[in-house]
Every structure is written in C-alpha cells, then in structure tokens.
Amino acid sequence: MSIGTIVQCIGAVVDIQFPRDAMPKVYDALVLQDSGEASFAEKGLSFEVQQQLGDGVVRTIALGSSDGLRRGMPVSNTGAPISVPVGHGTLGRIMDVLGRPIDEAGPIAADEKRAIHQKAPKFDELSPSVDLLETGIKVIDLVCPFAKGGKVGLFGGAGVGKTVNMMELINNIAKQHSGLSVFAGVGERTREGNDFYHEMKDSNVLDKVAMVFGQMNEPPGNRLRVALTGLTMAERFRDEGRDILFFVDNIYRYTLAGTEVSALLGRMPSAVGYQPTLAEEMGKLQERITSTKTGSITSIQAVYVPADDLTDPSPATTFLHLDSTVVLSRDIAALGIYPAVDPLDSTSRQLDPQIVGTEHYEVARRVQQTLQRYKELRDIIAILGMDELSPEDKLAVGRARKIQRFLSQPFHVAEVFTGSPGKYVPLKETIRGFKMLVDGECDHLPEQAFYMVGSIDEAFEKAKKLQ
C-alpha cells in the first residue's frame, strides 16, 4: 500500500503525489490518513483517481467535503476501485456513495463487497423482454406501457410532478411486485429522501428496498458516483436470478455532477457547457442497467428537463437509452389534470399490436387521434368559438375533453394533500373505459364526471350524483 501527499487542492479536485513506481491506477480509491495533527478535514475521506498527470501525480475527485484539507497531508492507495456492500444485508438500509450506513442503525451485515465500476453484460447474455408491467396508472398503461426489464424515463420541468409520479409507481409496483427494489437518490432534496423512507416504512415494504443517497448538498464526486453505487447493488440481486426494480431520482443531476467534475478537471466544455464525455458517461451507466438471462432490472428514472426544453443535450442523450418515455407537461398541469402526462408526446416501444394486442393498440391510437384533432381545432375555437365547428368536429372536441379529464387519476401518495383516496386501475378496466369513450358510449355524460376518477364505472356514478 503506497502513501502519497496532497500537492494541490481546488474545490473537490485534489492532486496527490505518489512515488513514481507506485502510482495509482485510474478509478483506484485513495484514503486520507490520520496525520495526528489538529484538522477539521473529514476522517477517512476517500478520493477517486480520475487522471494521471505524470511524475507520480494523480488528479482525484474527493468523495466528501474537501474542507480542511491542506498540502502535505498523507493519503494511502487502497489499490482497488471503490467497493460497496451488496446482497441481502443492504435491504432496509440507507447508505451513502461508499456504502456506509447513514440511518444510524448499526453496521451493514453484508458478506460481499463489489467494485462500483463494472463492465456491461456481453451481448450474448442479454435477454429481450416483451412482458408488460402493469402500473395501475391509466395514462401510462394506455399510451406508454412499461416492459418488464425495460428502461423508463419520466421527463418534466421543475414542479410538474416527476417525484410524485415516481412515488406512485413505487407504491403501485414495489408493493404489487413483491420483489426487491433499489432506490438511488442522485442530487435531489434530502426531504424527498426522508419522505420516501417513511413512505416505505409505513407500507411495510422497507425490508425489500435498499436505498442509496447522494443528495444535492453533497460534493459533485458523491453525486456522480451514487448512481453507480445503487446500480452495483441492483446488479448483484439480478445476478442471483431475481427481478429487480431500480429507481433513480434524478438522472439529470448525475449529468450535472459530471459537468461540475469535468470543469474542475480542466476539460473543454461542449454544447451548453456540458462535459465533452456526456454520451460516454450516460452510456456507461445505462448499458449496465439491463436484463440478462439470469435476472432482470426494470429501471424507472426521473429526468429533469431544464427550462422545459426536451432538445437540451442532457435529456436528449437520455432519450436514446429508454424503452418508454413519459413526458410530463406544464400545460396539462396548468389545467389541473394530474398526473400531467402528455399522451401525444409520451412514447413506448411496447405499444405494438404484437405485444399489447390489437384492441389495446387501436384504442390507444384512437385516443391519440381524438386528442390530436382537438389540439388542431383549439386555435379555431379560441378565435371563432365552438359554434363555427362542423357537427363532427364538435363531437370530437366533446370526446377529447372527456378523454383529457379521464386521463386524470387520484394517487395514493397524494391522498394527504388532495383528500381523495388513491385509485389503482387494472389494464383491462383502462382499455374498457377508453374504448367506451372513443365509441361514443359516454357522449351523454357531463365532462366533470370524468375528472379525478378511477374506472369508467366511477364516472357513471359521479354523473348520477351531478344530475
């Protein structure tokens, strides 16, 4: 084990000099030694080697606060990448980027440790999946169904409901699924992590979830690596032959941490100031989130969209890797329709008659056609009013407005602030309800009857009460 000394410290980037014949490899973990003198530097602070500068000097990223560091402090080389505990000992626990417990519930009883940098599975080990994963959320099950073992992205700007949608999916899938889940909180609010922990605890599914957090108050090194820590734990369960759910909130913060690190390392920025290695970093993470012949990882990722611009390099790079994209729209949220999913922008590879069946496919496409027609007529209505439309168009607008309201749904996780109990709608009920709407069987019902209900039967009951 070689010992080096700190020669330069700029924010989270620390240069450390080692003997020339004992230079650490890229991605090796280094640990700050106790020099015996008074300093408020974090004890046992870890560093990850990013670059070899020559003459025995390596450039590293501190995985923790670099406050209190100074030149000349001794640092030892562990000779291996960062390794984190994996296996059943991690379930029900909250850990940081290095796999250390932060829930004050004692040490983690894991027999095995695994390096966070792993190769993606080989091509011949991959297993394509066409099984559908029912979420109980009407708009998602209808227009952008999820695949078991697939990758899903929840795209949205600030405050349109990504985290609430993520929580509802965890509530509906993790509880129904009864399998194991891993949650990686990447650069999000600590309060949300706390809410998530208590939500899981109250639902009695805490013993099936491993939680890893690198929140927004942490240095960029932690936020950059915490997604890999969570993924390493999920991969271990997958390699056991299990079906795993892997939740990431938020992938954009992973990119942002990469941007901060890249700038500190002195790389030339590319478009919009992002790191030049954006596509490679995203690919390294996403290619590992995959299903093999032994087990599957179904991944649900929240993706923040800066300034609601889906063409921004970060969300645009994420799009490439996903099977389903759920786009949350500010315009729909402004109408008070929650979940604010845009049924025209959201897509899924699974929406194929050979996978979902002809009936589901046709109903989904007819719903989208009706909504698209309404979108086209909106300008005419705004200028000339409804009276100028042809009878067919009036009918289409009436149906579209009912469909729009029927796409709303009360959530279990939002019961506290909506006051209405959450609804889980099975896929068959969802298809039946929308089929009746597009077939004109509900033309006589008022629009309000469809707002914030579960199944179509509830809409009929609500209509009776409104009369």
From Swiss-Prot:
Calcium among keywords: no
UniProt keywords, alphabetically: ATP synthesis, ATP-binding, Cell inner membrane, Cell membrane, CF(1), Hydrogen ion transport, Ion transport, Membrane, Nucleotide-binding, Translocase, Transport
Cellular localization per UniProt: Cell inner membrane
InterPro entries xref list: AAA+_ATPase, ATP-synt_VA_C, ATP_synth_F1_bsu, ATPase_a/bsu_AS, ATPase_alpha/beta_chains, ATPase_F1/V1/A1_a/bsu_N, ATPase_F1/V1/A1_a/bsu_N_sf, ATPase_F1/V1/A1_a/bsu_nucl-bd
Catalytic activity: ATP + H2O + 4 H(+)(in) = ADP + phosphate + 5 H(+)(out)
GO MF terms held by the record: ATP binding; ATP hydrolysis activity; proton-transporting ATP synthase activity, rotational mechanism
Pfam families (alphabetical): ATP-synt_ab, ATP-synt_ab_N, ATP-synt_VA_C
Major localisation: membrane
Enzyme Commission no: 7.1.2.2
SUPFAM superfamilies cross-referenced by the UniProt entry: C-terminal domain of alpha and beta subunits of F1 ATP synthase, N-terminal domain of alpha and beta subunits of F1 ATP synthase, P-loop containing nucleoside triphosphate hydrolases
Protein topology in the membrane: Peripheral membrane protein
Highest taxon, organism lineage: Bacteria
Protein family (similarity comment): Belongs to the ATPase alpha/beta chains family.
Assembly mode: F-type ATPases have 2 components, CF(1) - the catalytic core - and CF(0) - the membrane proton channel. CF(1) has five subunits: alpha(3), beta(3), gamma(1), delta(1), epsilon(1). CF(0) has three main subunits: a(1), b(2) and c(9-12). The alpha and beta chains form an alternating ring which encloses part of the gamma chain. CF(1) is attached to CF(0) by a central stalk formed by the gamma and epsilon chains, while a peripheral stalk is formed by the delta and b chains.
Role summary: Produces ATP from ADP in the presence of a proton gradient across the membrane. The catalytic sites are hosted primarily by the beta subunits.
The protein's name in its UniProt record: ATP synthase subunit beta
